[in-house]
Amino acid sequence: MVTQKRTHYEIFWEILTFCKTPKSFTSIINRCNLNSKIGQRNLEFLKKRKFLLQVEEEGAVLFQSTEQAKQYTVLFSKTYRELFDNSPEFRL
C-alpha cells in the first residue's frame, strides 16, 4: 500500500487540533510524527500567524491553539471532507 506524504496544511491541522489544550513541544512532535527541526519550524510559523500561543505553566513551555486557529481547522475539515468524502484524522 502506497502512503502519500502529508501536506503542510494537514500537518498544521493536526498540530492545531492536538493543541486545543496546552501541549509540550515533545508531545506535539511525537503525536504529529514530526522531527524536531520541522516541528520547530511549523510551530514558529503558526505562532507568527497567531494560530498558536506559547504559554508557560508551572515552569513548562506549552503551546495552545488560539480562537483564530479554530477558523482554520473548521475550514480545512470542511474542504477535506468535500474533496475526499471523509474527515481528516490523525495518523497513528
Question: What residue spans do the PLM features occupy?
Answer:
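A short acidic, leucine-rich amphipathic alpha-helix
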Residues: 27-31
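Short capping segments at the starts of secondary-structure elements
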Residues: 19-24
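Amphipathic alpha-helical dimerization/coiled-coil segments
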Residues: 74-92
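Short alpha-helical segments that sit at the start of domains
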Residues: 1-13
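Basic, amphipathic "hinge/linker" alpha-helix immediately C-terminal to the N-terminal HTH DNA-binding motif
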Residues: 59-76
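A short, conserved structural fragment
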Residues: 47-57
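Short amphipathic alpha-helical interaction segments
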Residues: 34-48
